[in-house]
Swiss-Prot record:
PROSITE patterns in UniProt: IG_LIKE (PS50835)
Tissues of expression: Widely expressed. Expressed in the cochlea, in Deiters' cells, possibly at contact sites with the basilar membrane. Expressed in both outer and inner auditory hair cells. In the stria vascularis, detected in the basal cell layer. Not detected in thymocytes, lymphocytes, macrophage or dendritic cells.
Protein name stated in the entry: Myelin protein zero-like protein 2
Membrane topology of the entry: Single-pass type I membrane protein
Keywords assigned: Cell adhesion, Disulfide bond, Glycoprotein, Immunoglobulin domain, Membrane, Signal, Transmembrane, Transmembrane helix
Domain of life: Eukaryota
Length: 215
């Protein structure tokens, strides 16, 4: 039994060695996962990838869409050396290429969002010989307004604090200005009173001298 096993094991070992030398790699896709955008605005559907194979002319990118309320999958965009926009359908004249394959970026830009754009967008990248891998997904929610987040509240708080500081500085500067002006007015008034008293005193002295001369 054991004497015959090497003939059976040898092909298996060779196949394992070949698999180890030439492993099957997969393209990894990265997306935001979930995204909210306001109705009527434009949104960037970001999709990046990593691949063990160098990016070349064989790279292909396929974007598809499945509505949230169900229905068949719809074509959104295709890229192979050049971008190919949809010639018909809901995304005609509403989607443009916004990626850079050399930087592993295959994002697209969707214009003039509508409420029926709610759904899941898929991003599939093939970079031969890396053709396997999971498809990236983005769940887009089109809303009337984007709810305030902590970042917005923080920005409002910082802006309010800066405005308050500016107001305080202005009040202090104005207070110092009017205070100096008031002291200057008081000094001028005191100087004027002193001058009048000196003038009266001089006139009194002149009268006294005149009376003495008359006598």
């Amino acid at each position: 039994m054991y004497g015959k096993s090497p003939a059976l094991v040898l092909p298996l070992l060779l196949s394992l060695q070949l698999t180890a030398l030439c492993p099957t790699e997969a393209v990894e896709i990265y997306t935001s996962g979930a995204l909210e955008a306001v109705n009527g605005t434009d949104v960037r559907l970001k999709c990046t990838f990593s691949s063990f194979a160098p990016v070349g002319d064989a790279l292909t990118v396929t974007w598809n869409f499945r509505p949230r309320d169900g229905g068949r999958e719809q074509f959104v965009f295709y890229y192979h050396m050049d971008p190919f926009r949809p010639m018909s359908g809901r995304f005609k004249d509403r989607v443009v290429w916004d990626g850079n394959p050399e930087r592993y970026d295959v994002s697209i830009l969707l214009w003039k969002l509508q409420f029926d754009d709610n759904g899941t967008y898929t991003c599939q990248v093939k970079n031969p010989p890396d053709v396997d891998g999971l498809v990236g997904t983005i769940r887009l929610s089109v809303v009337h307004t984007v709810p305030f987040s902590e970042i917005y509240f923080l920005a409002v708080a910082i802006g309010s604090a800066c405005a308050l500081m500016i107001i305080v500085v202005i009040v202090v500067v104005l207070f110092q200005h009017f205070r100096k002006k008031r002291w200057a007015d008081r000094a001028d008034k005191a100087e004027g009173t002193k001058s009048k008293e000196e003038e009266k005193l001089n006139q009194g002295n002149k009268v006294s001298v005149f009376v003495e001369d008359t006598d």
